[in-house]
């Protein structure tokens, strides 16, 4: 860690503590050259994989896009917003757990469908109808039948 006062490279950690909910570490450091003390905060950087669309275009994972798609399916449904946020967190964890740098939109869509199936069956059908591009009533009926199994 470079000293913010003299830019020296040699610093030592005097004290380390967890901050808040334990997701951050506060470190008290001292420069070995100028002896000034300063504080740093460290957090884990959780990198999300890039998303590869069906046409081959690659784009950064967009949590807002994920949330808006789920909320559109859940519109006017009796689902707690905390449950939605937990589902989004779980989906993000599953994507990070793949260890891949890139994931297909199909995988993201399937994770969303799994989450919606647990949250609200009507929202699941709404999302599936758009995601799977249902063409007629028969396809709706088949999906509903699978849901009841």
UniProtKB/Swiss-Prot annotation:
One of its GO terms (biological process) is negative regulation of DNA-templated transcription. The keyword Nucleotide-binding applies. InterPro entries: ATP-cone_dom, NrdR-like_N, RNR_NrdR-like. It comes from the Bacteria. Its cofactor is Zn(2+). Residues 49-139 form the ATP-cone domain. A zinc finger (unnamed) spans 3-34. Binds 1 zinc ion. GO terms for molecular function: ATP binding; DNA binding; zinc ion binding. Disulfide bonds: none annotated. Negatively regulates transcription of bacterial ribonucleotide reductase nrd genes and operons by binding to NrdR-boxes. Belongs to the NrdR family. This is Transcriptional repressor NrdR. It comes from Edwardsiella ictaluri (strain 93-146).
């Amino acid at each position: 860690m470079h000293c913010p006062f003299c830019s020296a490279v040699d610093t030592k950690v005097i004290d380390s503590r967890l901050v808040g909910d334990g997701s951050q570490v506060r470190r008290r450091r001292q420069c070995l050259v100028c002896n000034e003390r300063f504080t740093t905060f460290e957090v884990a950087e959780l990198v999300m994989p890039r998303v590869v669309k069906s046409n081959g275009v690659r784009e950064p994972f967009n949590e807002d896009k994920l949330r808006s798609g789920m909320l559109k399916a859940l519109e006017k449904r009796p689902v707690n917003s905390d449950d939605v946020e937990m589902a989004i967190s779980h989906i993000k964890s599953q994507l990070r757990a793949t260890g891949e740098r890139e994931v297909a939109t199909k995988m993201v869509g399937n994770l969303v469908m799994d989450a919606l199936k647990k949250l609200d069956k009507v929202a699941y059908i709404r999302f599936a109808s758009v995601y799977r591009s249902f063409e007629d009533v028969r396809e709706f009926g088949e999906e509903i039948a699978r849901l009841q199994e």
